[in-house]
Design a protein with these regions (language model features):
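Canonical Radical SAM [4Fe-4S] cluster-binding loop centered on the CxxxCxxC motif
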Residues: 1-28
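N-terminal [4Fe-4S]-dependent radical SAM core
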Residues: 1-3, 34-41
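Alpha-helical scaffold elements adjacent to nucleotide-binding pockets in ATP/GTP-utilizing enzyme cores
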Residues: 29, 33, 63-64
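Conserved AdoMet/S-adenosylmethionine-binding subsite of the radical SAM
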Residues: 38-45, 50-195
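Conserved small/polar residues in nucleotide/adenosyl-binding loops
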Residues: 198-205
Length: 205
């Protein structure tokens, strides 16, 4: 589900960022992406991981989440919904405190300098600050915290990165989702091979 038309974050690996930002979606426009599906009654989960940065349009996103989870709306369990974000600090804290949906952080590198190259938002909202903020909340029960990690060939796919990930996330009740990269035009990034995935998984468990 998308939260914006376009996106301001300009992550190197994302095609949406190359298109620039046009507008925020309203709560009704966000909900309509679900309601207009012929299969909507068969949906089991919704992920806010489409176009846009949800925390950059948080007022409307929270309204949409309320409609999805409230008894007067769709009455879905918050456990059926995951919000994915680069981690805008102010919005992140508000999101955590105002609803109970699952949270997924786009990580992609445990190293600040490298993450800044992949995700310019790191320069304003560092991953280390986010981790320290997240440690103030309990993710050991119903609510799930995960970190998304696209594995790039020769960039973040070595055992060194697995160790840095463990160091960064130590003390958090979370999971790391390893994601395959699908190439986009004009970007000098390549997806890692299966061996790299296996090595990373072995060090994370």
């Amino acid at each position: 589900v998308s939260s914006q038309v376009g996106c301001k974050m300009n992550c190197k690996f994302c095609m949406t960022g190359k298109q620039g930002y046009t507008a925020n979606l309203t709560a009704s426009q966000i909900i309509n992406q679900i309601h207009s599906l012929p299969e909507r009654d068969k949906l089991t989960n919704v992920v806010m991981m489409g176009m846009g940065e949800p925390l950059d349009n948080l007022d409307e996103v929270l309204k949409a989440l309320e409609l999805l989870t409230a008894n007067y709306g769709y009455a879905w369990s918050p456990k059926r919904i995951t919000l994915s974000t680069v981690g805008l600090r102010k919005g992140l804290q508000r999101f955590i405190e105002e609803n109970d949906c699952h949270l997924a952080i786009s990580l992609h590198s445990p190293l600040t300098a490298q993450r800044s190259e992949l995700m310019p938002a790191e320069r304003a909202y560092s991953i280390t600050e986010m981790v320290e903020l997240l440690k103030n909340y309990d993710f050991s029960k119903q609510r799930r915290l995960s970190f998304e990690y696209i594995v790039f060939k020769g960039l973040n796919d070595s055992q060194v990165y697995a160790k840095e990930l463990l160091k960064l996330l130590r003390g958090l009740d979370c999971r790391v989702n390893l994601i395959r990269f699908h190439a986009i035009p004009g970007v000098d990034l390549e997806g890692a091979d299966t061996v790299s995935y296996t090595h990373l998984r072995a060090h994370e468990t």
